[in-house]
Amino acid sequence: MSNGKRRYFPGANTGRGFIGHFEGIVPPWSEPHYTYVLKGGPGVGKSTLMKKCAAIARANGFTVEEFRCASDPESFDAVRIPQRRLVLLDGTAPHTIDPAMPGIDGETLDLGRFLHKEVFKRRREELFVLAEENSAHYKNAFACLSAAGSLRRAAVSEAARSADLTMIRTFLKEGFTLPREGTPRTLFLTSPTPAGVADFREAQDAENTVYLPGVLGAVFLNEAMKLVQNTQTEI
């Protein structure tokens, strides 16, 4: 971990489309957090507000977990401050979220009031064209990711048939101490983005990191996933 900061993606662009695990922002084994759900369209300052809150928290000695947007890794989807049991979260599409019990577990902040409506109106036609182009580019990108994902899954399946799964499972059980039983926390450390593949593996506080490249590494990780499925583990 660097400077009290950890980074994740709560959702990722994958060969099966966009997959979100926003429920993993707060670990299931943690005490309840109070969540400020930020509303309003693009350009109203949701990410900017979260960045400023994160900077202030770090400056005051708090650990901060940053959750970046897979559509723009420089933009924030959420910020968590564990010691304060506090979350700031973008609750707009495509991951629309609202407090389950407003006033008890969270509240909504409407940043739409800060939208420069006249500026948007002046560029109305341009913005509609750009939105259509963006949608077309995403459709093409996900088609490519889907094709790559199919090839990857086929390769991993073939590797699993030739691997000694019993030996792998024995190695995992003997070599790693499992956390206590519970519900795992699922998030992403890498994702394809419009800026390329973003990788946050170095922004963690793991004592030891083991890299398992290639399709055989994927087989190994699949078995590890099965082993920790019902434990308090970050996956």
Model segments located where?
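N-terminal accessory targeting/assembly segments
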Residues: 1-60, 65
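Short beta-strand-centered segment that lines the nucleotide-binding/catalytic pocket of NTP-utilizing
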Residues: 39, 59-74, 226, 233-235
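Short, surface-exposed basic-aromatic patches at helix termini and helix-loop junctions that form
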Residues: 55-59, 80-84, 100-103, 227-231
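Short, flexible loop segments at the rims of nucleotide/cofactor-binding pockets, characterized by
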Residues: 14-15, 64-69, 187-190, 215-216
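Glycine-rich phosphate-binding P-loop
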Residues: 36-54, 195, 206-235
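N-terminal pre-Walker A segment at the start of P-loop NTPase domains
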Residues: 1-27, 162-203
